[in-house]
């Protein structure tokens, strides 16, 4: 909106559809779908690691979660996470943990359910308080691939008419603010 060059500005529709205006349920759904996209079957794993989206998320991992996202969670939730699988410190596993805790909410310990709350609002609030940049950076990351693939799973979150402007802005800012990371990650 504040870009001096009109070609770099999102149209009003793009601004109105920004995740800041989504309800909590839509935000959680978006993050869960992103996790699903990044956790495709093993035959696709090499392709997923080469996605611009994956590179962008990992390039911004410290901005999203610090050195280890697991340390930002309450100890009861950390314990609950370890019961079902091993999560590493990468952003893909952070998204997977959020997705799994939402999809298997009834299987959580009473303590973990109390921490996360019973509603979509309280659930999202917990994760956004622990990781304030997660939604924004994930949205930027997904825009990079949606621009190219028009993936139907993400069509409720993006519109092709403005996605190329959004993706171009994400790339431009990444190059300007993190040149050492963009070149090292082949971004």
Regions picked out by a protein language model, each given a short descriptive name:
Residues 1-4, 185:
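Short intrinsically disordered, low-complexity coil segments enriched in acidic
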Residues 3-29:
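Terminal C-lobe "cap" of eukaryotic-type protein kinase domains
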Residues 26-187:
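Regulatory extensions appended to serine/threonine kinase catalytic cores
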């Amino acid at each position: 909106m504040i870009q001096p060059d009109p070609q770099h500005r999102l149209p009003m529709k793009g601004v109105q559809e920004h995740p800041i205006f989504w309800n909590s349920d839509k935000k959680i759904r978006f993050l869960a779908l992103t996790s699903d996209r990044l956790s495709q079957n093993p035959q696709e794993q090499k392709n997923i690691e080469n996605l611009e989206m994956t590179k962008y998320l990992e390039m911004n991992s410290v901005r999203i979660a610090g050195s280890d996202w697991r340390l930002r969670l309450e100890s009861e939730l950390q314990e609950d996470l370890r019961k079902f699988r091993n999560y590493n410190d990468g952003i893909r596993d952070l998204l997977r943990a959020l997705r799994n805790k939402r999809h298997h909410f009834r299987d959580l310990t009473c303590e973990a359910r109390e921490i996360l709350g019973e509603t979509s609002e309280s659930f999202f609030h917990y994760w956004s308080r622990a990781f304030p940049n997660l939604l924004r950076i994930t949205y930027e990351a997904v825009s990079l691939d949606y621009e190219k693939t028009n993936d139907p799973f993400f069509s409720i979150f993006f519109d092709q008419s403005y996605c190329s402007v959004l993706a171009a802005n994400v790339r431009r800012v990444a190059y300007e603010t993190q040149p050492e990371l963009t070149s090292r990650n082949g971004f």
